[in-house]
Amino acid sequence: MDGGDLRSSIKKWNVIYPVYLNSKKTVAEGRRIASGKACPDPTCVEIADCCSHLKIPHAIELDKAYPRDFFQVGRVRVQLKKDDGSPVNPAIKTKKQLMIQIAELVPKHHGRTKKQEPAASSTAGTSKGKGGKKKK
């Protein structure tokens, strides 16, 4: 399969923007799953890592932007069905099921767990500022 064939087949894959899974966004702003199941601020790389964990073929497109908010750059294309119409992963048949699975995996992503550990220890420091009484 040459590059042209691959590119044309990727065009038929489903698109997942990080906004679809972002719990900080409203439905009007583009979230596609319930806020209780969504995760805060997912990235394209985290979504792609979750797709590879779920054994779903995917392609990251970092040069593409979300149409409603063009400051949010990046999207992931995923292949849910093979050419014959059968699902790639029998446990995941629809795009919504895939988005829910990814949203469950993103908070457990190794990049997030490493970021949160140092932040928790550094915020437990002393508080600065004047603590005197205010005059009436």
From Swiss-Prot:
Q: Where in the cell is it found?
A: Cytoplasm; Nucleus, Nucleolus
Result of changing residue 31 to Q: Abolishes RNA binding
GO MF term list: 7S RNA binding
In terms of InterPro entries, this protein maps to: Signal_recog_particle_SRP19 (IPR002778), SRP19-like_sf (IPR036521)
Tell me the segments the record calls region Disordered.
106-136
Described purpose of this protein according to its UniProt entry: Component of the signal recognition particle (SRP) complex, a ribonucleoprotein complex that mediates the cotranslational targeting of secretory and membrane proteins to the endoplasmic reticulum (ER). Binds directly to 7SL RNA. Mediates binding of SRP54 to the SRP complex.
Q: Give the family this protein belongs to, as stated in its UniProt record.
A: Belongs to the SRP19 family.
* Name the record gives this protein: Signal recognition particle 19 kDa protein
The organism encoding this protein is Oryza sativa subsp. japonica
